[in-house]
């Protein structure tokens, strides 16, 4: 059997003494906690004081351990980056940090308490806490505020002069139901410039969108004229027309538009200057001429030299022809 060295013997003796003392102290502390008679002894008071000091020291160590960078979920709910020193005397945690996520409920409680204190002080002292200077007028008494409310309740309509009304035509107004752009008609001395606008209302002349400087051919108009039933231009107001309209050549000008209405001649979209009306799309039946076959779209020029068969091949037709229906019935 190998002999023990003096150093090893000293280590074993020290460990035995420490373990025996710690076991005795633990047994004594447990006995002080469990037994009410032993808790009255002075040694038990000393043990309780040591335990409280140890708990306070562990709490201080926990506060000091907050000077770190933590990532992920923490058991204490502190997902933050903190820098600086912690003061253990403060009842709340140090605020020199960057925190991400939800704050601890203790901090919310402290903020609520601070706000309640400020409100209570303000109500008791009748003073307002200002954080910056204000340029508002001094507060008035209750009687002045009541008179001001009564005065504000009375609203009168502003008088508009005719000159001012003519000057404000270059804007978008809601109330007179139009949007107008361009020059003032008083500057030019003509009403032609009034046609560069979009107007909406009950007046039949104002239900259109018009663009251009001169005649009525460059606009889109919708609606009927109920007050003037004998007007020749009543049917001409349900269309969209594009291009220039010359007074000398009204027939060609009428073919550059899309017209909608009950008149069978005006249920079509026509493009071009061809007088033979071959470049258009027409829809609807003609009650006076049932064999006119106007339900088609035609493209190309149709001259007088071409045969009828060649003219009929340059379009797309929808519907039944009267001659073909007769042939089908006879067959």
Swiss-Prot record:
GO terms for biological process: neuropeptide signaling pathway. Its main location: secreted. The modification Phenylalanine amide is found at residues 71, 83, 100, 174, 181, 200, 211, 222, 242, 260, 271, 283, 299, 318. Keywords: Amidation, Cleavage on pair of basic residues, Neuropeptide, Repeat, Secreted, Signal. Residues 26-65, 86-94, 103-168, 184-194, 203-205, 214-216, 225-236, 245-254, 263-265, 274-277, 286-293, 302-312, 321-331 form a propeptide. Pfam families: FARP. Present ubiquitously in the brain and regions of the central nervous system as well as in the periphery and throughout the dermal chromatophore layer (at protein level). Excitatory neurotransmitters that directly modulate chromatophore function by activating chromatophore expansion at the chromatophore neuromuscular junction. Belongs to the FARP (FMRFamide related peptide) family. This is FMRFamide-related neuropeptides. The gene is FMRFa.
């Amino acid at each position: 059997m190998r002999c023990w060295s003096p150093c090893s013997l000293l280590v074993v003796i020290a460990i035995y003494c420490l373990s025996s003392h710690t076991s005795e102290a633990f047994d004594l502390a447990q006995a002080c906690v469990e037994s009410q008679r032993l808790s009255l002894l002075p040694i038990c008071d000393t043990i309780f004081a040591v335990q409280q000091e140890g708990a306070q020291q562990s709490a201080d160590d926990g506060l000091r351990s907050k000077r770190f960078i933590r990532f992920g979920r923490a058991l204490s709910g502190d997902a933050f980056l903190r820098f600086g020193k912690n003061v253990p005397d403060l009842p709340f945690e140090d605020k020199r940090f960057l925190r991400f996520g939800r704050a601890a409920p203790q901090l919310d409680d402290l903020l609520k308490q601070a706000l309640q204190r400020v409100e209570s002080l303000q109500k008791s002292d009748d003073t307002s806490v200002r954080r910056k200077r204000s340029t508002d007028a001094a507060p008035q008494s209750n009687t002045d505020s009541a008179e001001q409310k009564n005065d504000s309740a009375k609203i009168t309509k502003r008088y508009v002069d005719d000159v001012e009304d003519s000057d404000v035509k270059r804007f978008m107004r809601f109330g007179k139901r139009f949007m107008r752009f361009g020059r003032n008609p008083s500057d030019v001395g003509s009403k032609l410039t009034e046609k560069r606008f979009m107007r909406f209302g009950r007046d039949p002349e104002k239900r259109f969108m018009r663009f251009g400087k001169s005649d009525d051919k460059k606009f889109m108009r919708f609606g009927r004229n109920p007050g003037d039933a004998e007007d020749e231009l009543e049917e001409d107001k349900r269309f969209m027309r594009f291009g220039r309209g010359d007074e000398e050549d009204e027939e060609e000008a009428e073919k550059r538009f899309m017209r909608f209405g009950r008149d069978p001649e005006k249920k079509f979209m026509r493009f071009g200057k061809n007088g033979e009306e071959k470049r258009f799309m027409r829809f609807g039946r003609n009650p006076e001429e049932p064999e006119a076959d106007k339900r088609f779209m035609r493209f190309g020029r149709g001259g007088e030299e071409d045969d009828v068969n060649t003219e009929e091949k340059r379009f797309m037709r929808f519907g039944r022809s009267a001659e073909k229906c007769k042939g089908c019935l006879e067959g």
